[in-house]
Amino acid sequence: MTKEQVLAQQRADFAVAKFIEEILGSGHIKECTFDETRDSAIECAKQNIEASSLTEREKQVAKESVDKTVHEIAKIFKKGMIQSGRLIETK
């Protein structure tokens, strides 16, 4: 793994741990924790793409696809979390 991959993985691991800690502790998740979990997952995926043997164009397309897909999924998930009362809006 590259240094960037390791750092992205550590960031994602910490974000997931915080997400789990909040949901198990209070039954709720702060919006900033939700957003950090999403953003760290995207960064982790992008670092893995960057380290791959794809061409530069393929890497660019893959990163854009990951970004768009994860944001769409997170948007749907976040909406459900807000409707269920599990997400605490912090913005």
Per-region residue spans from a language model:
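Acidic, low-complexity, intrinsically disordered interaction modules
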Residues: I29-K68
